[in-house]
């Protein structure tokens, strides 16, 4: 990076098992750290150190919190995002890709996220977030900012900035597998409404619903329901 910041890469040359691997990697890393050490976690492939972090600690301490999470930009709409991930503090949705905090509280929080059988780290982050008063969301985006596709060209004043990954076939398939468990009921209800409102299309809509339900049963992740 252009600022010469020392970075510890976690999970390199390890087999990817799922999103919770990131949490496990952080917990392993901080196991040897002191409780009062402050750790910053950044997703490796889509995050930029946008500004010199020389004043990072002083900015963090002004938030008067032990753990600071980044805010989800909700590019797919607030309702859908909350349906998938839940919410954290002040009606904001936490993003699991950027966060920082003291080792002591991070251990408590991150270990709590691993208690869930759900394989989606971001949903677990939001569920566990509600349990602890020592967590805040970076609503002002002074330290962390997650850029959504519709604000991709926006200049950011945050120290760390995460950009959306490019859309690909593999990403689309992965999204279906992981997130259809939260949305399939809504989709089937919409198809049912469509059949009622447009009876002439009853047959094709029925087969679309049957196809989607079959794909869901066979392939979708169901760990969070």
Where in the sequence are the language-model features?
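N-terminal anchoring/stem segment of glycosyltransferases
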Residues: 1-38, 190-225
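Structural alpha-beta junctions
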Residues: 2-9, 62-66, 130-137
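A generic structural motif
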Residues: 7-16, 69-73, 120-122, 137-144
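Conserved beta-strand elements of beta-rich interaction domains across eukaryotes
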Residues: 14, 46-47, 54, 74-75, ...
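A conserved donor-nucleotide-binding helix/loop in the catalytic core
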Residues: 15-42, 48-52, 94, 118-129
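A general structural motif
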Residues: 35-37, 64-66, 156-158
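Conserved donor-nucleotide/metal-binding helix-loop-beta segment in metal-dependent transferases, i.e.
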Residues: 47-88
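Catalytic core and acceptor-binding pocket of nucleotide-sugar-dependent glycosyltransferases
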Residues: 92-186
């Amino acid at each position: 990076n252009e600022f010469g910041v020392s970075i510890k890469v976690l999970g390199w040359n390890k087999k990817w098992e799922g999103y919770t691997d990131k949490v496990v990697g952080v917990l392993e890393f901080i196991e040897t750290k002191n409780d009062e050490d402050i750790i910053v976690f950044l997703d490796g492939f889509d995050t930029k150190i946008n500004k010199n972090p020389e004043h990072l600690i002083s900015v963090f301490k002004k938030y008067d919190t032990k753990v600071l999470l980044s805010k989800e930009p909700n590019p797919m709409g607030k309702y859908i995002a909350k349906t998938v991930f839940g919410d954290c503090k002040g009606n904001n949705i936490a993003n699991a890709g950027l966060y920082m905090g003291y080792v002591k509280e991070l251990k408590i929080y991150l270990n709590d996220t691993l208690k869930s059988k759900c394989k989606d780290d971001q949903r677990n982050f939001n569920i566990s977030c509600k349990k602890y008063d020592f967590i805040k969301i970076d609503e002002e985006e002074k330290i962390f900012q997650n850029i959504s596709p519709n604000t991709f060209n926006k200049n950011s004043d945050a120290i760390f900035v995460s950009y959306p990954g490019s859309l690909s076939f593999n990403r689309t398939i992965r999204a279906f597998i992981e997130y259809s468990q939260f949305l399939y009921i809504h989709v089937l209800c919409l198809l049912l409404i469509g059949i009622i409102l447009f009876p002439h299309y009853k047959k094709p809509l029925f087969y679309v619903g049957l196809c989607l339900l079959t794909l869901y049963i066979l392939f979708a992740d169901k760990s969070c329901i």
